[in-house]
């Protein structure tokens, strides 16, 4: 348990270095999520200083069956979690398989109307998925294919966080 708490602390420290840079590159809100008690929890965020943005406060609990970060977290979660979420019917096995194959997931208006997002996994040194990092914002700015705009930048940010773990 102590080692897990240290890993979470290290991940947060790395995220606090990387998330603002990713926010500056994208001009959009950036979040880091993990699974906790069957939900996705925002554990770090960085928001643009002005303008319309998708605000998710640290500590917010969100459902695991909608949104890009949920797809990422569930795609690499334990089978019991995958089965539970698949039974809800919002996320499909095909979506999870596609997420694992591409290394990212996107959503358009799933969690909140008018908001789009793209997310990638954050792994530890052994390759275990610990979290999901996401860029989110208004569909009007991000467009209907946010992965085309930000998946590569997210993957780079994820790699940097992994190197800090």
List where the protein language model places each region.
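All-alpha effector-binding/dimerization core of bacterial HTH-type transcriptional repressors
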Residues: 9-51, 79
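Extended hydrophobic
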Residues: 88-159
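Signal-transmission/dimerization alpha-helices at domain junctions
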Residues: 75, 157-165
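Short, small-residue-biased leader/transition segments that mark boundaries at the very start
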Residues: 3-8
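Short, acidic, Ser/Thr-enriched surface-loop or helix-capping motifs
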Residues: 1, 35, 124-125
């Amino acid at each position: 348990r102590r080692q897990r708490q240290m890993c979470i602390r290290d991940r947060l420290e790395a995220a606090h270095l990387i998330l603002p840079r990713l926010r500056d590159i994208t001009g959009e809100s950036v979040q880091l999520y993990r699974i906790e008690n069957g939900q996705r929890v925002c554990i770090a965020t960085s928001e643009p200083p002005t303008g319309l943005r998708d605000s998710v406060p640290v500590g917010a609990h969100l459902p695991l069956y909608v949104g890009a970060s949920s797809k990422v977290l569930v795609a690499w979660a334990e089978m019991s979690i995958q089965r539970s979420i698949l039974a809800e019917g919002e996320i499909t096995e095909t979506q999870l398989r596609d997420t694992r194959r591409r290394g990212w997931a996107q959503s358009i208006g799933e969690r909140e109307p008018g908001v789009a997002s793209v997310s990638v996994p954050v792994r530890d040194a052994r390759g275990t998925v610990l979290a999901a990092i996401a860029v989110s914002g208004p569909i009007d700015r991000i467009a209907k294919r946010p992965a085309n705009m930000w998946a590569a930048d997210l993957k780079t940010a994820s790699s940097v966080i992994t190197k800090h773990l």
